[in-house]
């Protein structure tokens, strides 16, 4: 029995989509357990590029069951747009390949409207939301006023809950200067969604449990990254769900003891999108060089990513919080060509060196990175297909990551394509 989770070990955008696609070859079931279509994964297979937001990366493989779990918030319009996009690229998306939890909460038009209005109202204190309605949907979920997929399957129940929500939300929308929403328009649109969605809807918790009990390999695909976790991230510049391994059990509907391995995905450097402290950020030519060579622009928003040196304090924190059993280091190819490479091994705060990630943003903003310097590797590594083919300086860099975090590197990424992947160890 093997059930393992793939998680972002930094601020997201670490290459989880590619690695999930790669590891999906060994899995029979691939599960999304949190987030929504605010996530963005890019996967390159042969000469085709696929951009995924909501559907698990395993959809690119035939004979894999892909699951959108109860912890995910689902925008039906975005879901069907993605299905149509994939089928246009020749990828079949049928109810035999994709199922959606009947307990998942629905993103409604008023969630998106409120997301935009509230972000605008924050002014210079905006939190960098993608304005996809994710946060307001999770708010309704925990406020117990949300509408779930199972509600959509019963038109009378859906109509009643929708009417109550629209009456309440329109008052808030009006207060924020927006235009009130129309019940009939939303009801009719979602009734059309209901008929198309119905064949995909199942009790996904049962399906996942049965797969694990049948000794099938189940891969849980995390979205965003550990530092965007609602509890352990750089709050309030975070997402609205639990992005750590702790979120798998509740977001997929299984016992925590069923997940046997946790694989953390980390870039060979660090990036983040939006506001918030970033101790190793490079606001210079080197940072610009990394951004351009690594094509560091968001899949969902197109926003440029802030770039900096690899921060081992972050990776050590992720290892502790998520119980990582191994690390995957991606984009080692991006650093090829730099004469010197630095790696953060601690923070100086108030005259003391610490090796943990402070909860307070004010404290984090005052942290000065303590660096170790490494010799770069001039050779391009995009064609390397084994660990032995990597430059010695790159191996030294990887060994230091293992030493500091106490976690083995199992896979190294040397490019965006599926075959640009080096398996260092079979064990995850």
UniProtKB/Swiss-Prot annotation:
Q: Per the annotation, how and in what number is the cofactor bound?
A: Binds 1 Mg(2+) ion per subunit.
Q: In which pathway is this protein known to take part? A: Purine metabolism; AMP biosynthesis via de novo pathway; AMP from IMP: step 1/2
UniProt xrefs under CDD domains: AdSS
Q: Which reaction does it catalyse?
A: IMP + L-aspartate + GTP = N(6)-(1,2-dicarboxyethyl)-AMP + GDP + phosphate + 2 H(+)
- Top EC class per UniProt? ligase
Biological process (GO) annotations held by this record are: 'de novo' AMP biosynthetic process; IMP metabolic process
What Pfam families does this protein map onto? Adenylsucc_synt
Q: Where does Mg(2+) bind?
A: 13, 40
One GO cellular component term of this record is:
cytoplasm
| Annotated localization | Cytoplasm
Q: Which residues form the active site?
A: 13 (proton acceptor), 41 (proton donor)
Q: Which InterPro entries match?
A: Adenylosuccin_syn_GTP-bd, Adenylosuccin_syn_Lys_AS, Adenylosuccinate_synth_dom1, Adenylosuccinate_synth_dom2, Adenylosuccinate_synth_dom3, Adenylosuccinate_synthetase, P-loop_NTPase
* Chain sites annotated for binding IMP: 13-16, 38-41, 130, 144, 224, 239, 303
A GO molecular function for this record? magnesium ion binding
| Disulfide bridge map | none
Does Acetylation appear among the keywords? no
Keywords recorded for this protein, A-Z: Cytoplasm, GTP-binding, Ligase, Magnesium, Metal-binding, Nucleotide-binding, Purine biosynthesis
Q: Which positions in this protein are listed as binding GTP?
A: 12-18, 40-42, 305, 331-333, 413-415
**Which residues bind substrate per the record?**
299-305
Q: Describe the protein's quaternary organization and the partners it interacts with.
A: Homodimer.
Output the NCBIfam families linked to this UniProt entry: PRK01117.1 (NF002223), purA (TIGR00184)
Question: Which family is this protein grouped under?
Answer: Belongs to the adenylosuccinate synthetase family.
General function of this protein = Plays an important role in the de novo pathway of purine nucleotide biosynthesis. Catalyzes the first committed step in the biosynthesis of AMP from IMP.
What name does the UniProt record give this protein?
Answer: Adenylosuccinate synthetase
Record gene name: purA
